[in-house]
Amino acid sequence: HIYMTFACPLSLGQESECECVDVKTEAEAPDFEQWKAALNAIMPAGIVITHVGPVQMKADLIAYACYRITYPAAAAAALDAYNALESAPVEKHGKKGNKIIELKDHIPQVEYITEGDSLHIDLCMPAAQELNLNPSLLTGFLEEKFGLPAVSANILRKKFLTADKQLFV
């Protein structure tokens, strides 16, 4: 029997360079390279398994997920307007019901870099069991408040960090 636990499942419409899944097997000495080859053989186009190995850190050590959000360069006006706000309340939908989260507590300012006709935002958001925030809260707020279409954002998860901001491996 195989038992699988997905840490921080990715939301629909988002991309990731770092997915992690813990697999528990009864095999005493699994051949990780064989697992990697077998998994890659059945993955959809564009999805590549880059590493299979013994657990180094338990999934509950994940505290933050870091993202790169790419918008058209014209989004700068909405981001500047967000930065000028004192408060940015959003409704977070969860298993225990909905609650209001103050985005400014977690993203006080949105820093961005413009490259040609795009701009990039690099940010880390809480991804712990106690509090898990999705970047779609920000993109949804920007759409609702400033008319910046959330669908114009490309959201790419880059890495996970522990509570002390070390790379989760």
Language-model region placement:
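Short, charge-patterned binding micro-sites
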Residues: 1-26, 55-58
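Short glycine-/aliphatic-rich beta-strand segments at the starts of folded cytosolic domains
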Residues: 19-23, 63-71
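Helix N-cap motif at beta-to-alpha junctions
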Residues: 26-32, 72-76, 128
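Short amphipathic alpha-helices in soluble, non-transmembrane regions
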Residues: 33-43, 78-87, 137-142
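A contiguous pocket-lining binding segment that forms or flanks enzyme active sites
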Residues: 66-101
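Core RNA-modification/binding signature centered on pseudouridine synthases
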Residues: 87-169
